[in-house]
Each structure stands twice: as C-alpha cells, then as structure tokens.
C-alpha cells in the first residue's frame, strides 16, 4: 500500500538527528600496533601489571616459570607457553590472589658455547681461554634474554621483568652449589666409570633429556657367529641324550657357533662376553651343510629367514645350561665366556644371545660388573677407536669403523648376514648428530637411592592431563642414575678437588659451603679465575699444592632443576611447593623430572602441587615447523604484520592470545594463516559487540540514569540471568584451565545471545525512544552492567581489548583499570533461571519466523523484516505458556512479542489470512507471513495504520511523533 502523505519528498523533514545513534571512541578496528603498546604503557605507569598481583591481600598463588633457553628468536612454542601462563596469572590476580610471577632463563650449556665459537675465526679461537669463553657466553646469553624479554612484554605478559631469575646469576649459582652439596651429604652423588650417552660431535656426556630420536636412522645390523671353544660337562651330557650324533669320537661337540645380532658392529672389538637369559629356551640347530648354531628357540625361524639359511632343531636346552661356554673372539686371538645376563635379554628381537661390551652399554656394564669382566672403553671423546681396539685404532665409529670390521668378519667366516636396520637411535639434540654409549668417569646422582620417594611424590601431585602421571611415573621407575657432569666450559662447575698424585677426592661440607659463599659474591667464573689456594677454605690452605680443580660442569638440567631451590623457596611472596608448573609435554623427561628429583632428594617432596602440560605448535597441515619446509609461523609477524600486509596482516597481540585460548592445548595445536583469519573474525565479533554496547552508553551515567534491577522488563532480567550463567561458565573454564571453553562461551554470548537476539530486539528501544525513556534507560542499564562484565571476563585473554573497553566506558568508574575491578561477580538479583524455559521456546519460534522472513527476502518479496506481518497458531503447550508469560508483563512496551520477532504486527490465532507470502506448519505452531498493512514510519521504519496528524510530521508514526515533538 502506498504512502499518501501530502508532504513532497523535497519538503519532508529528516529524522536522523532525532535518533540516538552510536557515539564512542572505541574503534571498530583495534589499530593494535599502536594501541596495545599505549595500554601497556598505561599499566606500567599506574603499577597495574606486576605490582597489582603483588599488592593483593589474598592467598599466594605461585606459577613457577620453567626457564626457556636464552638462545634464538621467540617462536610459536614460546607464545603458547607464555600466554597460557599469563592467562592463568591474570585470572588469579583478578581473583584477588597474591601473584608474583618471576620469569626465568636457562643460560648455560653447549648451544650458547657453540654460538660464541661460531662467531670467532681460527686465530681468535686459538687465543681463547676458558674464562674468555665464559665472559663471551654470558654476554651473549644476557643479550638473548633482553631480546626475548621484549617479545614477552609485547605479548602482554606480566611478570617481575626487573628481577627475573637467570641461571648465570651469582645467587642462583651459589644456591645450586648448596643443593648439590645437600645431595652429596645425603649420599646421592657419586663418581664412577659408567657407560653414558656420549656425543662425539659435542665431546661431552649427555642426559636422556638432551637426546632426540629422529625418524629415518638406519644402522648396519649384523648376525655374527662366535666359534665355541669349550663347553661345560652338563651341556655335553644334555647333547648326548638328545642328539648323540653331534658328539664326535673324542666325546666333544662338533664345531658350533653362538649367534649374536648387533646394530653397532664397531663394538665387536670390545666384546668381553656373550650373555644369555637363564629362563629362556635355546636350541642347537643344524643347517643343510651340517654347520651348527646356538640361538633362542623362539627366534630360530625369524633368524633363518633373515640370514637365508634353513635350520633343523636338534637340541633344546635351558639358558642356564649355556653358562660357562668358552668361545673364541672372531677378530682377535682371545677367548671369553658365556654368562647369565638378566631379563633385558628377550625374544622380541635379535637372537636371544647378547654380545656384551661392558664399556658400551648399561646392561652390558651391569653384567660386566657382576662377572668381573674387563670394562674397557675402546672409543675416545671424538668417536675414534683407541689402541684398545687393536688394529682398528683411528677408525671413526660413526663413519668408517663399521665397514672395516664387517669386512674382517666376512674374511674370518664369522658374518652370517648384514642387513640395513631402520630404528630409533639417539641423537644429540643440539648438534643433530648421532651419539654412542661410552664408559667414562662421570659424576652421577643416584636415583636408585630415592626412586621410591620420587614415585611416592608423583602420586601426591595433580597431573593435567592425568596421563602425565603415568608418563613420568614410568620414566622415573625405569631410568638409571642421572649423569650430571659435562665436559664443557660454559656451566656451573662441579666444586670438587682431585689429588694430584693420588686417588683422593676433596668434597665435603666445608669446601662446598666455602665455594657457595664465594660464588654468591663473585659468581662461578672464579672457579677458572682463582688459584686452588684462593678457592679452598682456610683450614685447607696448607694443602693447596696437593689438590687440583675439577674441570667438569653440571648438566644444564641440574641448573634448571634446581630453580625451585634458588627462586620459589627463597624469594618472598612465593610458594614452595609451587601451586603450578606449566610446560610442554616433553618436560616430563626434562624440567619436571629434574625438578622432581632434586626436590625429593633433598626435601622428600615434589616442588609442585599441580603440573599442567601442553602440546606443540604445528602448521595447519599438522606438520612440525621447520625452515626446510618453509612453514614457520613467526609470532612477531602475527602481531606486527609481514612485509606484505595483505598476506600477513598485523593482528596484534590479542589475536595471538585468543588463538592460545581457542585450542585444545593438551594435544599438539595447529596455527596458520587460515586459522588466524578465523580467530581474527571471532576477535572482531567480540570487539564489535562491545563497541555497540559502548556506543549506546554515551549519554548514560549509571549512578543517575540506571533502573533498579527489580523494575527491569523480563527481557532485560533474562539478559542479566544469562550473563550470570556466562560468568559461571567462564569462571569454571578458567578455574579448570579449559580456556577453549572460554573461547566458545564468549563467542556464543556475544554473537548468539547479544548480537543476534538481545541487541537485535533492543535496537528499536535504543535508537527510537526518547533519551530518558524507561524503554531506553532500562536497556542502557543492562548494557552498562554487561559491558563491565564482558571487559572483566575477557581480561585474562584479551587483556588489551578489555582495558580499551574499560577506558572507553563513558561514565565514571571507581577503578582506573579493569584489572583493579577484580573478577566479575554475580549479584543475587541477577539470577532467575525460571526465565530460561520460556525464552528458549520463544527463541525457537523466533528462529522459525526469521528463517521464513529470510526466504521472503531471498525471493525479493520483502526487504526489512518490518515490512512483514505475522500470524501464529500455537499447538504446543510450552510455546503457549511462554507467550502468555510474556503477555502478562509487556513492561512499559518492552516485552512485546512483535518487537521480539522484529515485525510490524503480530496476530496470535484467528482466521487464516487470504494473502500470504509464505506459510509453514510444524509440531508446535502454524506460521503465516504477509505484507504489513499501513504506512512506513520514516523514523522507526515500522508500518502503522495510524500516522501522525501533525502537518510537519505526517511521515512518522504517533509514537515517533511524541518523541520528536518533545525534543
């Protein structure tokens, strides 16, 4: 129906200036590269960041920082870790806890030493002394710390940046020496010859945590026959019973070979015995050419296939009967025994007979000690065979030694087969090169001495996810003693003195205490700078000529593993045990374990109450990030943008933080350009919803204009109750470290509950009503309460946006910062869950109507939903009850069903309409949509039958006329 108002189009008044349009300085775009640093400066200026948590009066909460390594640029793993920690700390701070987060750095170790050496030419290296190297390494580490610290700050991470802990600090080194001393006094530290993981490329021993196992390593595996020289009498008797034809006329067994399998041919020269399991069943088997071998019965078929020879079983014997066989070495003129090993000898692989070189394997070493075998190390620090290997001296065990030895085994008739074998093999995590087992004199922590206490302590800790407990339990249960010495310069020295002309070691309470005191004042450099006489306590000065300093340094895992001793058990406002340790899942064998072992050894309990782990950051295709794949995502590029801003836009720190909150970090997490776009979209939705709330509060002062909660319309009361539910849900999410639930809940709240429902309905109240109308003020009351809560709820994650919102709330607030307000609480008056069932039914009906209206728009039958009239026949009791519930209220023309459905008119029941655009019947209602009757109000866009009679305003409805004339 056409509008027949008499005013010409030219003379009609415009009503834009009479509407309450949005006004706010809170931009649609974050402009994060400029705005976020401004907000960080505001926090520093007002002492709101670290100082806020420190000045809280609640109970202390301590998240102890696992120190990142002070080398290299920050990557997505750093971002995932540090942002997770910051989310937790900010949440605990807002809850009123006393939070003192002390960030730390691991500053010693080979990678830094190598960086220093790589930056020098040959002449500089030739002039390099240990102390010069240490000075350069310290300077390098401190520079790296400064750069990484700047990055963490830019991410919005709060912490005691003025007083971080560094493992190179004097006090830290002194505390570490004292901890080492306490373990010495308890009998948990010893020196001994043992096979350890040795890195020829680094020329130092390595701990298990310093190893990695890349895929694709292939070894030369060999089956070797060791010719039997002599057999014990009881074995001869057993053979005579089962296969007398194998005994010759002299009563001796015909030629037979013991078959072993190994993946390290270079260890054959070091063979001292062959070990068998006395519980296993072995067999003497005969080939078609009548040659005999001894092998585990269960492995005969598999070995036959591998070597390509068919064998017939002739004699079955227990492993215990093999004890005492004497065999000849296949390469040297030497005889050795068959001995009984342990349960490490199985039939899972190999032959059931284990080539035993006590200097090159832990099980071999233990068996060697048991039988008093020679424990010789045939390899030097660089990986070359020594004179103990005879004619093979000078060959490199990782290069040419294997080929030469295999060739000689072929020539001696001892090699049955060589087969390439792909398997997990330990590599040096720093140099990315293979390691070996090598027996050397090292310092060890005797884990066996406190293993049971450590396992008990694990049970007292909450592990998240729970699988972490089983993981670390099995690691501690199965691990050997901890090799804590390293043959490097850049580290904390093991404070021991060795007798120059004897075997004695000087290491006692007096010497350790004295060294610790010296380190606390001068630092560990003095171990290299001072003479022995300057390092010994006064009572030993007359013996200075007798002693010399040790040259070993401590494993860097001992450094970081002692951080609880120098940080959380020493500094004020920190808890020991810490409330939480949070690191990557690889730290079960790293920092979690080293911290656990040192704390249990000294204090018999874990240094943490709860341990939370996260996975690794991968690319969008689930691949590990690497330069070779070209798939590295740089957190700095996420924040500031790349060289091509279209490809790599500047998202800011909050989008990075929102990504962290969005993922299931208990597993490995993907990140890439597509994911960032999705996260940015969610960020924008939260921001724009917040902007809409702020923009409608420009003329609102809560103290003056707010409406009492009890007098609010039903829709508003429902909105507050829904906000209360969201606060509960998000609080639980933060408390349980389930940040992805926060992400989902806040997104759903802003988009579904606010933008698509409450605010969609509220637009008419906000824009069209007079400024001080109850319809508008009641809605503004809700908007002000909700925006304050949203600001608080997002603050731990979207800290910059939350603060920006707070600074743009147009009325006076008692707190200068959202973080000073504290965690959002829920007033009792907000809660009324009885609304939910009715609103749910009405929203269900609203969704049907919206879908039908959308269909009309798509068919170009309608433009705005206000061009429609709706008739509904209700057939469902719940929907009918909801409509009646709303009709009973209609508070000041707010709770009107047509406004909830955003149509110009609504009819419940009555006769079906003759002319409809679309209709639908479902289980709970019959819905018809038709063109609205009447005239379109040019101010509110509703269609009304009766329009203004005022000659100046004939194009607006009577409701709008009252508002306009009152202006």
Curated annotation (Swiss-Prot):
* Record's cofactor remark: Binds 1 zinc ion per subunit.
| Annotated positions binding Zn(2+) | 937, 940, 957, 960
- Name assigned to this protein: Isoleucine--tRNA ligase
| Gene Ontology biological-process annotations | isoleucyl-tRNA aminoacylation
Please tell me one Gene Ontology term that the record gives under cellular component: cytoplasm
For this protein, the record's InterPro entries field holds: aa-tRNA-synth_I_CS, aa-tRNA-synth_Ia, Anticodon_Ile_BEm, Ile-tRNA-ligase, Ile-tRNA-ligase_type1, Ile-tRNA_ligase, M/V/L/I-tRNA-synth_anticd-bd, Rossmann-like_a/b/a_fold
Motif window: 'HIGH' region = 68-78
Q: Where in the cell is it found?
A: Cytoplasm
- Residue positions binding L-isoleucyl-5'-AMP: 583
Give one GO molecular function term: ATP binding
Tell me, how does this one assemble? Monomer.
Chain sites annotated for binding ATP: 627
* Keywords attached to this entry: Aminoacyl-tRNA synthetase, ATP-binding, Cytoplasm, Ligase, Metal-binding, Nucleotide-binding, Protein biosynthesis, Zinc
> Motif 'KMSKS' region in this chain: where?
624-628
Give the domain section of the comments. Answer: IleRS has two distinct active sites: one for aminoacylation and one for editing. The misactivated valine is translocated from the active site to the editing site, which sterically excludes the correctly activated isoleucine. The single editing site contains two valyl binding pockets, one specific for each substrate (Val-AMP or Val-tRNA(Ile)).
- SUPFAM superfamilies tied to this protein: Anticodon-binding domain of a subclass of class I aminoacyl-tRNA synthetases (SSF47323), Nucleotidylyl transferase (SSF52374), ValRS/IleRS/LeuRS editing domain (SSF50677)
């Amino acid at each position: 129906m056409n509008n027949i108002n008499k005013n010409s189009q030219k003379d009609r008044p415009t009503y834009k200036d009479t509407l309450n349009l949005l006004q706010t300085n809170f931009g649609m775009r974050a402009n994060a590269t400029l705005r976020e640093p401004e907000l960080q400066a505001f926090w520093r200026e007002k002492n709101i960041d670290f100082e806020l948590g420190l000045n809280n009066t609640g109970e202390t909460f301590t998240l102890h920082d696992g120190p990142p390594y002070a080398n290299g640029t920050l990557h997505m793993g750093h971002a995932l870790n540090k942002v997770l920690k910051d989310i937790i700390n900010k949440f605990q701070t807002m809850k009123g806890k006393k939070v003192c987060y002390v960030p730390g750095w691991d500053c010693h170790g080979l990678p830094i030493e190598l960086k220093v050496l790589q930056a020098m030419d040959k002449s500089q290296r030739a002039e390099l002394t240990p102390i010069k190297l240490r000075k350069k390494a310290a300077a390098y580490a401190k520079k790296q710390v400064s750069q990484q610290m700047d990055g963490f700050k830019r991410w919005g991470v709060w912490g005691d940046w003025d007083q971080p802990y560094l493992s190179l600090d004097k006090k830290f080194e002194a505390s570490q020496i004292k901890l080492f001393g306490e373990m010495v006094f308890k009998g948990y530290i010893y020196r001994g010859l043992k096979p350890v993981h040795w890195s020829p490329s680094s020329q130092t021993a390595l701990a298990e945590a310093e190893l990695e196992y890349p895929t694709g390593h292939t070894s030369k595996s060999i089956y070797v026959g060791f010719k039997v020289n002599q057999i014990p009498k009881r074995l001869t008797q057993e053979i005579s019973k089962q296969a007398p034809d194998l005994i010759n006329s002299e009563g001796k067994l015909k030629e037979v070979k013991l078959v072993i399998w190994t993946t390290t041919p270079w260890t054959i020269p070091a063979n001292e015995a062959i070990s068998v399991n006395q519980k296993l069943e072995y067999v003497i088997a005969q080939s078609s050419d009548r040659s005999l071998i001894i092998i585990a019965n269960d492995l005969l078929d598999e070995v036959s296939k591998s070597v390509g020879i068919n064998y017939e079983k002739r004699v079955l014997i227990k492993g215990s009967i093999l004890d005492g066989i004497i065999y000849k070495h296949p390469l040297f003129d030497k005889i050795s025994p068959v001995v009984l090993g342990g349960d490490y000898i199985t039939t899972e692989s190999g032959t059931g007979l284990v080539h035993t070189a006590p200097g090159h394997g832990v099980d071999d070493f233990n068996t060697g000690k048991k039988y008093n075998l020679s424990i010789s190390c045939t390899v030097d620090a660089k990986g070359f065979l020594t004179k103990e290997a005879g004619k093979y001296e000078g060959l490199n065990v990782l290069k040419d030694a294997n080929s030469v030895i295999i060739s000689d085994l072929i020539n001696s008739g001892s090699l049955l087969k060589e087969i390439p074998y792909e398997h997990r093999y330990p590599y040096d995590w720093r140099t990315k090169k293979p390691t070996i087992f090598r027996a050397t004199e090292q310092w060890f922590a005797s884990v066996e001495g406190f293993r049971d206490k450590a396992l008990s302590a694990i049970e007292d800790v909450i592990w998240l996810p729970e699988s972490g407990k089983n993981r670390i339990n099995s690691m501690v249960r199965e691990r050997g003693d901890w090799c804590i010495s390293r043959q490097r310069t850049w580290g904390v020295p093991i404070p021991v003195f060795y007798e120059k002309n004897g075997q004695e070691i000087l290491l006692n309470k007096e010497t350790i205490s004295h060294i610790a005191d010296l380190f606390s004042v001068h630092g560990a450099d003095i171990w290299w700078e001072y003479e022995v006489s300057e390092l010994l306590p006064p009572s030993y000065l007359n013996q200075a000529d007798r002693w010399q300093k040790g040259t070993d340094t401590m494993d860097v895992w001992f450094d970081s593993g002692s951080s609880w001793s120098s940080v959380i058990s020493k500094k004020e406002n920190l808890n020991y045990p810490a409330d939480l340790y949070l690191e990557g899942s690889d730290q079960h064998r790293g920092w979690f374990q080293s911290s656990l072992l040192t704390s249990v050894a000294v204090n018999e309990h874990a240094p943490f109450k709860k341990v939370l782990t996260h996975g690794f950051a991968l690319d969008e295709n689930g691949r590990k990030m690497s330069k070779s794949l070209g798939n590295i995502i740089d957190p700095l590029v996420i924040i500031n943008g790349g060289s091509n801003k279209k490809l790599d836009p500047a998202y800011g720190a909050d989008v990075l933080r929102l990504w962290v909150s969005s993922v299931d970090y208990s597993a490995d997490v993907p990140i890439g350009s597509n994911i960032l776009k999705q996260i940015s979209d969610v960020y924008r939705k939260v921001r724009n919803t917040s902007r809409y709330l702020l923009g409608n509060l420009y003329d609102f002062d809560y103290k003056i204009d707010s409406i009492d909660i009890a007098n609010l319309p039903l829709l508003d009361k429902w909105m507050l109750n829904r906000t209360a539910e969201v606060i509960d849900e998000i609080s639980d999410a933060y408390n349980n470290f389930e940040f992805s639930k926060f992400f989902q809940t806040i997104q759903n709240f802003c988009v579904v509950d606010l933008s698509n429902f409450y605010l969609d309905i509220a637009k008419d109240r906000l824009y069209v009503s007079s400024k001080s109308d109850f319809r508008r003020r009641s809605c503004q009351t809700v908007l002000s309460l909700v925006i304050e809560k949203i600001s608080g709820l997002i603050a731990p994650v979207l800290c910059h946006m939350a603060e920006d919102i707070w600074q743009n709330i147009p009325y006076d607030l008692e707190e200068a910062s959202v973080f000073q307000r504290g965690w959002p609480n829920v007033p009792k008056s907000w809660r009324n869950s009885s609304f939910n069932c009715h609103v749910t039914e009405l929203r269900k009906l609203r969704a049907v109507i919206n879908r039908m209206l959308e269909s009309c728009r798509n068919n170009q039958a309608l433009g705005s939903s206000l061009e429609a009239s709706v008739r509904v026949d209700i057939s469902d009791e719940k929907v009918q009850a909801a409509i009646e519930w709303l009709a009973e209220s209609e508070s000041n023309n707010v709770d009107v069903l047509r406004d909830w459905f955003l149509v110009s008119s609504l009819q419940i029941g009555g006769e079906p309409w003759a002319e409809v655009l679309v209709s639908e019947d479902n289980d709970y209602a019959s819905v018809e949509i038709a063109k609205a009757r009447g005239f379109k109000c040019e101010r509110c866009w509703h269609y009304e039958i009766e329009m203004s009679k005022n000659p100046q305003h004939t194009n607006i409805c009577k409701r709008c006329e009252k508002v306009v004339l009152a202006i």
